[in-house]
Amino acid sequence: KKAKLGMAIKVLENAKMRNTGICGATETVLFHKSIAKKFINPLLNNLQKKGCNIYGDSDVKKIFKGKISLANKRSWHTEYLSSNISAKVVRDVYMAVKHINQYGTMHTDAIITSDKKTAKFFLKNIKSSIGIHNSSTQFADGGEFGFGAEVGISTNNLPPRGPVGLDQLVSYKYEVYGNGQIRK
C-alpha cells in the first residue's frame, strides 16, 4: 500500500512487456485495496498502450476504464507467456501472499513498496524461488545472477532425482532488493 506510482508504472511495464515469453515475466498484478483507485488506471492503461490484454477481478473491472475481460479462477493459474496479464485487488499483504502461494508458478514474484517491514514479510513468506523488492521480475535469469547460461529451471523445493547426499539437499531462495531497476 506504500508504493511510488512512477516506480510501479516503470517496473510493471518492464516486468511484463520487456520479454513476455520468459518465466520471469509478470503474469498477475495484485493491487492493495487502499491504493487500487489511484494505481489501477495508470498502470493498466500503460500496459494496454503497449499491447497487453487485461483480465481483472470484479474489483479491478469496476475501477479500470480501459478494455478488460473478467478474470476467472483459471486466469490466476495461467502462465500466459504472452501480452496478457491478470489483475486483482487484495485486502492486505497476507492476502497477496496467500494468492501467490495458491496460484503462482513459484518461480519469481515481486513487491513494490516503500514499507520495509511489508517487503520483508512478503519475501520471507512467498514460496517462490526468487523474491524481488522494488525491481523488475525480468532479472530472474541465470546470467543476471552470475550463473552463466541456464540449462534448466526448477521451482521445486526438493532436489533432482538420482543419488542424494548432503549437498543435494540444499534449496536456495533468492531475495533481490532494488530501487526501481528495470532490465534493458
PLM segments and residue spans:
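ALDH superfamily catalytic-core signature
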Residues: 1-82, 133
